[in-house]
Amino acid sequence: MRKNRRHEDELREVKITRNYLKHPQGSVLIEVGDTKVICTAALEAKVPPFLRNSGKGWLTAEYAMLPMATQERNQRESVRGHIGGRTHEIQRLIGRSLRAVTDLDSLGENTVYIDCDVIQADGGTRTASITGSFVALVDLFRKMKEKGICETMPIRDYVSAVSVGVVDGQLLLDLEYEEDSRADVDMNVVMTGAGEFIEVQGTAERVPFGRDRLTAMVELAGRGIRKLTEVQREILGGQI
């Protein structure tokens, strides 16, 4: 039995609070166990140079952590004067994941900015950021449609993400930091509501894994994704 008496195939408690901030068109606080991330979605009427005069839109993401989101204070990257490799990797992952379910052609020449700020970290911050940002994105798109910026909802499907790993020989879903820090294998999986893969990031931290273990990890992640999609569907009222 894991912390909080969780089973090996059980997600942490997930709570998503919509309209968490006053100013963004879309904003949520997502809580996955003790991990807490504020996700916002905002629209700007311009696109990167490579999309000018194309009639198409763009979506990009930024990710950051509060200095005391972890047990020991980390210096802000803005103070250090550069963004670290981990942050770059996570930002690109969030952006790719959301673009995969967004109809960029229907956005017009507008850019959606997704901002994810981790206020408390206990493992799974990048997966929580993707899951929460999707809800903020849908709220933004609903407001765009209401204002006539787009004729239809520029969203194709749900998207969420979850971690799986092997710890002490056991296959676990949705790793907390303590589990992740001693995992033999660590994997992050991003999937659509229809069960299609957007990204699979798997690493043998200590022990290589075979094809059967890989299949089992992907199947376990898929079960977790289905539950996360249900949470998103419920919080959004069942329609996107």
Curated annotation (Swiss-Prot):
<dbReference type="GO" id="GO:0008033">
    <property type="term" value="P:tRNA processing"/>
</dbReference>
<keyword id="KW-0698">rRNA processing</keyword>
<dbReference type="InterPro" id="IPR050080">
    <property type="entry name" value="RNase_PH"/>
</dbReference>
<keyword id="KW-0548">Nucleotidyltransferase</keyword>
<keyword id="KW-0819">tRNA processing</keyword>
<dbReference type="Pfam" id="PF03725">
    <property type="entry name" value="RNase_PH_C"/>
</dbReference>
<comment type="function">
    <text>Phosphorolytic 3'-5' exoribonuclease that plays an important role in tRNA 3'-end maturation. Removes nucleotide residues following the 3'-CCA terminus of tRNAs; can also add nucleotides to the ends of RNA molecules by using nucleoside diphosphates as substrates, but this may not be physiologically important. Probably plays a role in initiation of 16S rRNA degradation (leading to ribosome degradation) during starvation.</text>
</comment>
<dbReference type="InterPro" id="IPR015847">
    <property type="entry name" value="ExoRNase_PH_dom2"/>
</dbReference>
<dbReference type="GO" id="GO:0000049">
    <property type="term" value="F:tRNA binding"/>
</dbReference>
<feature type="binding site">
    <location>
        <position position="86"/>
    </location>
    <ligand>
        <name>phosphate</name>
    </ligand>
</feature>
<keyword id="KW-0694">RNA-binding</keyword>
<dbReference type="GO" id="GO:0016075">
    <property type="term" value="P:rRNA catabolic process"/>
</dbReference>
<dbReference type="GO" id="GO:0000175">
    <property type="term" value="F:3'-5'-RNA exonuclease activity"/>
</dbReference>
<comment type="similarity">
    <text>Belongs to the RNase PH family.</text>
</comment>
<dbReference type="InterPro" id="IPR002381">
    <property type="entry name" value="RNase_PH_bac-type"/>
</dbReference>
<comment type="subunit">
    <text>Homohexameric ring arranged as a trimer of dimers.</text>
</comment>
<dbReference type="InterPro" id="IPR020568">
    <property type="entry name" value="Ribosomal_Su5_D2-typ_SF"/>
</dbReference>
<dbReference type="GO" id="GO:0006364">
    <property type="term" value="P:rRNA processing"/>
</dbReference>
<dbReference type="InterPro" id="IPR036345">
    <property type="entry name" value="ExoRNase_PH_dom2_sf"/>
</dbReference>
<dbReference type="Pfam" id="PF01138">
    <property type="entry name" value="RNase_PH"/>
</dbReference>
<protein>
    <recommendedName>
        <fullName>Ribonuclease PH</fullName>
        <ecNumber>2.7.7.56</ecNumber>
    </recommendedName>
</protein>
<keyword id="KW-0808">Transferase</keyword>
<dbReference type="GO" id="GO:0009022">
    <property type="term" value="F:tRNA nucleotidyltransferase activity"/>
</dbReference>
<dbReference type="InterPro" id="IPR018336">
    <property type="entry name" value="RNase_PH_CS"/>
</dbReference>
<dbReference type="InterPro" id="IPR001247">
    <property type="entry name" value="ExoRNase_PH_dom1"/>
</dbReference>
<dbReference type="InterPro" id="IPR027408">
    <property type="entry name" value="PNPase/RNase_PH_dom_sf"/>
</dbReference>
<keyword id="KW-0820">tRNA-binding</keyword>
<feature type="binding site">
    <location>
        <begin position="124"/>
        <end position="126"/>
    </location>
    <ligand>
        <name>phosphate</name>
    </ligand>
</feature>
